[in-house]
Design a protein with these regions (language model features):
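Conserved active-site-proximal phosphate/metal-binding subdomains
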Residues: 178-194, 200-272
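Active-site entrance/lid segments in N-terminal catalytic domains of soluble metabolic enzymes
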Residues: 2-192
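Acidic, glycine-rich active-site loops and adjacent beta-strand->loop/helix elements
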Residues: 87, 168, 198-199, 221
Length: 272
C-alpha cells in the first residue's frame, strides 16, 4: 500500500488530480475542481503579470475556506500550483514566495528536480512530510517525469511523489507505456503516484489504480468545462476529436508532445 501524505488524503470524492493547463487553468476552474472532490491545479505562470498570482491565490484560498465553512461534512480537496523549476524561469523565486505566503498544499514541479525548492515547500508545514506523513497541512511536492531515471532523480532530490507522464498525455509527453512506467516505479517507490496519459473516464481511473497509481492525472477533459479559460470552438474540438486526431511530434517545439490536428490546422500548418 502506498504511503500517502495526509494533505493528499483530503480528496473528498475522486482519486483525481486536475493537471495544470497552460493558459487554460484559472482560479474558477481550480475552485470548481476542489469543491467537487478533485485536487485542482494551475501553473503559476498562467498569472500574468506576476503580481496577479497573489490575487489568484487569495481568491482560491478564500473560496475554499468559505466552502468548507458552509459544508463541514463535504470539505474541499487541496489545490496545487505548478512551478517550472528550470533556470530559465526568472519568476520562480517570486512565485515560490507567494506560494509560501498562502501555504499552498501541493506544489507540482516540472523541468528539473530542485532540492532547494522541495525543502522550501516542506518548511511550510514546519517538518518534512517525507519523514512524518501524518502532518495535517504540510507542503507536498509532486514531480512529473517521463521515465524511471528522472523518477529516481526527483525522489533523491526530495520530492514526495511522482507523476509519470505516459503515452497519450496531452502536450509534452513520453511515448512509454503506462504499464511499463508504473511497474518500474513501483519496484522501488511506495509514495504517492499520479498517472498521466489518455485518462478521461471512470474506467480509466480505475485502470490506473489497478496498475498501482494512487491518482489519475487528468487535463484535457477539463478543457471542455464552463470554467476553463478556452474559447468555445476549442472546447468543442476537444469533445469532437478522437485518438486519430492526435499528432505526436517534436516539430512544433523541439520536444515530443501530443497535439490536436485541428489546432495545428488553425495555426496555419498541415498536421500531415
Amino acid at each position: 500500500m502506498s504511503k500517502i501524505p495526509a494533505v493528499l488524503q483530503r480528496v473528498a470524492k475522486f482519486p483525481v488530480i486536475g493537471s495544470p493547463l497552460f493558459i487554460i487553468s484559472n482560479p474558477k476552474l481550480v475552485i470548481a475542481q476542489c469543491t467537487n472532490g478533485v485536487i485542482g491545479s494551475m501553473p503559476a505562470l498562467n498569472a500574468r503579470p506576476a503580481s496577479q498570482l497573489d490575487e489568484w491565490l487569495h481568491e482560491i484560498t478564500e473560496a475554499l475556506a468559505a466552502h468548507d465553512r458552509a459544508n463541514p461534512g463535504n470539505p474541499s480537496a487541496p489545490f496545487a500550483i505548478n512551478q517550472i523549476v528550470h533556470k530559465s524561469n526568472d519568476r520562480l523565486d517570486h512565485d515560490m514566495q507567494l506560494c509560501a505566503k498562502y501555504k499552498v498544499p501541493v506544489i507540482i514541479t516540472s523541468l528539473g528536480a530542485r532540492e532547494d525548492v522541495n525543502q522550501a515547500v516542506h518548511a511550510w508545514g514546519g517538518v518534512s512530510v517525507r519523514e512524518i506523513r501524518s502532518v495535517p497541512w504540510g507542503g507536498v511536492v509532486m514531480h512529473d517525469v517521463i521515465n524511471n531515471v528522472f523518477a529516481h532523480k526527483a525522489i533523491d532530490k526530495g520530492a514526495d511523489g511522482l507523476i509519470p507522464v505516459a503515452a497519450g498525455a496531452g502536450g509534452h509527453a513520453s511515448a512509454k507505456s503506462p504499464f511499463a512506467m508504473i511497474q518500474e516505479i513501483r519496484q522501488w517507490f511506495d509514495g504517492p503516484v499520479a498517472l498521466s496519459g489518455a485518462i478521461a473516464s471512470g474506467g480509466a481511473i480505475l485502470a490506473a489504480q489497478a496498475m498501482g497509481a494512487d491518482f489519475a492525472y487528468i487535463g484535457s477533459a477539463f478543457i471542455a468545462t464552463h470554467e476553463a479559460r478556452a474559447v468555445d470552438a476549442y472546447k468543442q474540438m476537444i469533445c469532437d476529436s478522437n485518438s486519430d486526431d492526435i499528432v505526436y511530434s517534436n516539430f512544433y517545439t523541439g520536444v515530443l508532445g501530443n497535439y490536436l490536428k485541428g489546432s495545428i490546422r488553425n495555426a496555419g500548418m498541415d498536421p500531415d
